[in-house]
Curated annotation (Swiss-Prot):
Classification via PROSITE patterns: ADH_SHORT
UniProt entry keywords in alphabetical sequence: Endoplasmic reticulum, Fatty acid biosynthesis, Fatty acid metabolism, Lipid biosynthesis, Lipid metabolism, Membrane, NADP, Oxidoreductase, Transmembrane, Transmembrane helix
Function: Component of the microsomal membrane bound fatty acid elongation system, which produces the 26-carbon very long-chain fatty acids (VLCFA) from palmitate. Catalyzes the reduction of the 3-ketoacyl-CoA intermediate that is formed in each cycle of fatty acid elongation. VLCFAs serve as precursors for ceramide and sphingolipids.
Catalytic site positions: Y227, K231
Protein name, UniProt field: Very-long-chain 3-oxoacyl-CoA reductase
Principal EC category: oxidoreductase
Organism of origin: Aspergillus terreus (strain NIH 2624 / FGSC A1156)
InterPro entries linked: 3_ketoreductase_fungal (IPR027533), NAD(P)-bd_dom_sf (IPR036291), Sc_DH/Rdtase_CS (IPR020904), SDR_fam (IPR002347)
C-alpha cells in the first residue's frame, strides 16, 4: 500500500501516456486522412477526365472498322424494318458501300419501291425482299427468311425492326395488344432473325451484327415501361451475344440512341440532339468498333456525337437508375402524354364538325 501511495503519481502518468500520445498524434493522423481524401479525389477526377478524353477521341477522332472487313464484294446485308426511317437509310448506305441487300419489313409495296431505288442508284447491287409482320411471330415467315438467305454470304445483320407505344401511357392502362406487339417485335423478332443469320457467320468466322437500342433501355422510362423493358432486354442479350461470338471474329454492337426524326419517334424537326436518319446511320457505320459515349458498356456504342456525350454524362455523372433521374424522366413523359391527349381531342373535335 505504501508502495502504491509513494508511486501513485508515476503510475498515473504511466497510464495517462496512451491518451496523451493519441492527443499528440491526432494532428498527424488527420493530415494523413486529409491527404488520402485528396488523393482519392484526385484519382477520381483524373480517371473521369481520362475517360472523357477517351470518349472525345472515340466520337470525333478515331475511325471505326472498315465495312469491307466484314465481307468481300458480293456479300449480303440483311436489314429488318427496312421500309422506312433508319432501316431504309441503313439499306441505302450499305448498298452504297457495295453490299447486296435483303430487305425485310411488313409492307410489300414499300419494300418493292426501295428495292427499285437501290438497283437504280447502284446497278451492281442485288436485292431480295420479304414482306412479313413481326408482330404475328409466324414460323412460316421465319422459314421463308431462312430459305431466302440459305445460300447467301450474309456478312451484315441490321436488327432495326421495332415498335414503341403510340403515346406515353401508364403501364396499368397499356392495352394487351400493344404490350404484346412491343415485346414480340422488339425481342422475339430480333432474336429469331439473329438465330437464322448467326450460324453462317460462325462458319465463315466473320460478320457484323448491329442491334438498335435506345436510351429507353439505358434509362428506366416511366409511361413507356414495356418499351423501356424490351430495350433493356436487348442491351443484356446483345452484350452476352457479343461475348459469345467474339471468338468467331464476329462483331456485335448494340447501338444506344436518343431521339431521331422518324415515324416511330413522331419527331419531325432536327436539332443538335435529334439527327435525321442519314446523319445518324452515317455515324453508326463510320464508328463500328468504337464505344463512343458508352465506354462502360461492352459490345455497345453511342456513336452519334450528341447522343454519345449525353450517354457519357448520364452514366458517368448523374447515374441512370437514381430516383432523381427516373423522376425527371417520368415528369417529361407525363407532359408529353398530356400534350398528345390534347392533340387527340382537337383532332377528334375537327372530325365531328
Amino acid at each position: 500500500m505504501d508502495f502504491l501511495n509513494k508511486h501513485s503519481s508515476c503510475i498515473s502518468k504511466l497510464f495517462s501516456c496512451p491518451s496523451q500520445w493519441q492527443l499528440n498524434a491526432a494532428p498527424g493522423w488527420q493530415a494523413i486522412a486529409a491527404w488520402a481524401l485528396i488523393a482519392a479525389g484526385g484519382f477520381f477526377v483524373i480517371s473521369r477526365a481520362l475517360l472523357f478524353g477517351r470518349v472525345l477521341l472515340s466520337l470525333f477522332v478515331l475511325p471505326g472498322k472498315s465495312l469491307r472487313s466484314f465481307g468481300p464484294k458480293g456479300s449480303w446485308a440483311v436489314v429488318t424494318g427496312a421500309s422506312d426511317g433508319l432501316g431504309k437509310e441503313f439499306a441505302l448506305q450499305l448498298a452504297r458501300a457495295g453490299y447486296n441487300i435483303v430487305l425485310v419489313s411488313r409492307t410489300a409495296s414499300k419494300l418493292d419501291t426501295l428495292s427499285d431505288e437501290l438497283t437504280s442508284k447502284y446497278p451492281s447491287v442485288q436485292t431480295k425482299v420479304l414482306a412479313m409482320d413481326f408482330a404475328r411471330n409466324q414460323d412460316s415467315d421465319y422459314q421463308k427468311l431462312k430459305e431466302l438467305i440459305g445460300d447467301l454470304d450474309v456478312a451484315v445483320l441490321i436488327n432495326n425492326v421495332g415498335k414503341s407505344h403510340d403515346m406515353p401511357v401508364p403501364f396499368a392502362l397499356t392495352s394487351e395488344e400493344e404490350m404484346t406487339d412491343i415485346v414480340t417485335i422488339n425481342c422475339m423478332g430480333t432474336l429469331r432473325v439473329t438465330q437464322l443469320v448467326v450460324p453462317g457467320m460462325m462458319q465463315r468466322r466473320r460478320g457484323l451484327i448491329l442491334t438498335m437500342g435506345s436510351f429507353g433501355g439505358l434509362l428506366p422510362t416511366p409511361l413507356l415501361a414495356t418499351y423501356s423493358g424490351s430495350k433493356a432486354f436487348l442491351q443484356q442479350w446483345s452484350t452476352s451475344l457479343g461475348s459469345e461470338l467474339a471468338p468467331y471474329g464476329i462483331t456485335v454492337e448494340l447501338v444506344q440512341a436518343y431521339l431521331i426524326t422518324s415515324a416511330m419517334s413522331k419527331v419531325r424537326r432536327t436539332s443538335a440532339l435529334i439527327p435525321n436518319p442519314r446523319a445518324f446511320v452515317k455515324s453508326v457505320l463510320s464508328k463500328i468498333g468504337r464505344n463512343g459515349g458508352s465506354p462502360g458498356y461492352a459490345y455497345s456504342s453511342s456513336p452519334y456525337w450528341s447522343h454519345g456525350l449525353m450517354a457519357w454524362f448520364l452514366t458517368c455523372v448523374t447515374g441512370t437508375m437514381g430516383k432523381l433521374v427516373v423522376g425527371q424522366n417520368r415528369s417529361m413523359h407525363e407532359s408529353i402524354r398530356k400534350r398528345a391527349l390534347r392533340k387527340a381531342e382537337r383532332e377528334k373535335g375537327k372530325k365531328s364538325t
